[in-house]
């Protein structure tokens, strides 16, 4: 009888054991949507909103009273720790890519009028030359919590790296709470740690198939193991010239002119999302052959290209061990 009671008690404990469950929170931030899945019952929506508010106040060029807007107006201002992290990372990637990644090119991008009919309108070369005088992150220095610009017209825009940084901030928030299983996604930029406790498997994320008609579908699903992934596409924001050549919104940081490209999508896997985000942007402008050469000295970066060949057919290329599934 005693043995029967013990067996029944053990069976009762197993039957009462909670099934693994994730918490999923969604919302809007940085002009896009976000989705966060994590292994905890606690709702952190308010904490996320507070973190996003602080990041926007620091680096949003859409907010007139943000720190970066004040710096772009040449107002004396002390930057915060978020700005320091992103600025220093931008400096390093600017150096590594020999200026291809440059957060000061935004004014030139904005100056190009692509026109409502999808045709690249002419832009006076003198205006481009004038704008290019203020381009170059090497013209901007950080002195502790002060930003110093050699040219007062230099316009700083962290749009190509800040979204990935926001992903990392949420991830680090979880790790401070000892939450080790999570997936953070903001506008397609992703950071994954641990596993999906519901499925008891690695986090699966999709690589989107390019469509020029704005439809969405997944080309393939891959597993992320304590990594981050960012994707930069050229197939949604492009215009054509009079000869039918397609141009994306990529501006050559050396010339100030848009570049013709056959690249459609570039996905980069790195240890943190800020790094992946910045390199995905840079690799759009570098092109496949230059990226191949670059990756020889950067084994920490995994890259996946989707591009058009000479027959206007889609092709893919995986580099540095980008996962197949």
Regions found by a protein language model. Give the residues of each.
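Mature catalytic core of soluble alpha/beta enzymes
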Residues: 16-325
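Bacterial Sec-dependent N-terminal signal peptides
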Residues: 1-24
């Amino acid at each position: 009888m005693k043995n029967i009671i013990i067996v029944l008690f053990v069976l009762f404990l197993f039957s009462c054991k909670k099934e693994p469950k994730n918490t999923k929170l969604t919302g809007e931030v940085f002009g896009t949507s976000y989705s966060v899945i994590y292994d905890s019952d606690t709702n952190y929506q308010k904490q996320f909103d507070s973190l996003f508010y602080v990041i926007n106040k620091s680096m949003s060029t859409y907010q007139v009273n943000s720190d970066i807007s004040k710096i772009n107006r040449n107002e004396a201002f002390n930057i915060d720790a978020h700005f320091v992290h992103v600025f220093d990372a931008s400096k390093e990637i600017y150096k590594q890519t020999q200026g291809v990644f440059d957060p000061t090119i935004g004014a030139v991008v904005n100056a190009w009028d692509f026109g409502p009919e999808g045709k690249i309108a002419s832009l006076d070369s003198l205006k481009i030359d004038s704008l290019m005088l203020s381009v170059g992150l090497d013209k901007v220095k950080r002195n502790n919590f002060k930003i110093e610009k050699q040219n007062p017209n230099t316009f700083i825009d962290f749009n190509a790296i800040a979204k990935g940084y926001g992903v990392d901030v949420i991830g680090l928030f979880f790790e401070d709470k000892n939450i080790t299983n999570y997936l953070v996604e903001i506008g397609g930029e992703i950071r994954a740690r641990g596993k999906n406790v519901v499925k008891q498997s690695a986090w699966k994320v999709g690589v989107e198939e390019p469509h020029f008609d704005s439809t969405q579908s997944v080309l393939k699903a891959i597993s992320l193991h304590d990594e981050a992934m960012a994707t930069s596409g050229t197939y949604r924001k492009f215009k054509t010239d009079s000869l039918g050549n397609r141009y994306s919104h990529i501006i050559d940081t050396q010339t100030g002119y848009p570049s013709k490209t056959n690249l459609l999508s570039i996905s980069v896997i790195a240890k943190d999302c800020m790094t992946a985000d910045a390199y995905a942007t840079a690799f759009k402008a570098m092109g496949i052959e230059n990226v191949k050469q670059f990756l020889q000295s950067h084994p920490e970066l995994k890259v996946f290209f989707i591009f058009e060949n000479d027959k206007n057919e889609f092709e893919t290329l995986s580099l540095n061990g980008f996962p197949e599934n």
